[in-house]
Amino acid sequence: MSTRPSKIVCVGRSYADHAEELGNAIPDYPVLFMKPPSSLSSLEKGISWNPAWGNCHHECELTLRIDKTLTAETNPAKALAAVGAVTLGLDLTLRDLQDDLKKKGQPWERAKAFDGSCVLADWVDVAEVKDWKHVHYTLHVNDELRQIGDTALLIFDIATLLADI
């Protein structure tokens, strides 16, 4: 298997609290967007962006590596079997630019898909995940707690998201 993915599919507005925090409606179906392979970066390399691009927000995300093909016929019950590994990632967003693009009704790619905007930690074998409904994670920046995540709070559970993707 190639170590470089053919595509990176992301889920926006996946947590009700975060959608409301940004003034977005809670979606009736998953909001998907993509990042190109050039957006990938290793956490070991650190995080950087051009400050001239504006304010950059980061969100810690549970990240799944899909090792088996998912099709339109894949149902949620079988979708989890396609996952080969998990990690945490940072989804970087040029928030001012994204807000401007949203107001104009334009796509978000310029704000979400720039080089280095998908920062990943090392992969962990999927066997380490004991309960997909309760994967808990935190993000600390300089020893300060910035984010708490838990799959129990997702609008759509992991299996449903995978089947939809």
Residue ranges and their predicted role:
Residues M1-I165:
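Catalytic-core "active-site belt" of small-molecule-metabolizing enzymes
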